[in-house]
Amino acid sequence: MNMFSAFNINASGMTAQRYRMDIISENVANAQSTRTDDGTPYRRKVVAFAEKGGNTAFATALNSAIGYKGMGFSGSGVKVTGVYKDYKTQMKMVYDPSHPDADEDGYVLYPNVDIITEMTNMIDASRAYEANATAFNASKSMVARALELGQS
């Protein structure tokens, strides 16, 4: 494991959380969008993450340190595997016969975006980003100190 692995791991976490915050912002912005380009209401989007592989030296050290015998950890950070539309959560039906998108019974189909859930997810993503940034700065301080020791 080289000294820049920690930077790469933390940077991947910050990038993933920033992307997650972008998608959450899009959900909040479209919470009242009853018609998209395809004529249907906006559907909430969710970001999926996966562990990056490849850092076997770190993984071996970590897994032996914790006594793990299974698959273990690769220790190379995180990556975004995709953005998926949420088809599990139902759309909201609201009676509003004056709305231009109302059906023949006067109901309007609204997006399946819950603002409270999205704001909670935004706080979670923000704190995860902040934790990665703090770890990044700690790694930077350790490398700077190691360089100072190497010069003495």
Ranges and model annotations:
Residues M1-S152:
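Amphipathic alpha-helical polymerization modules
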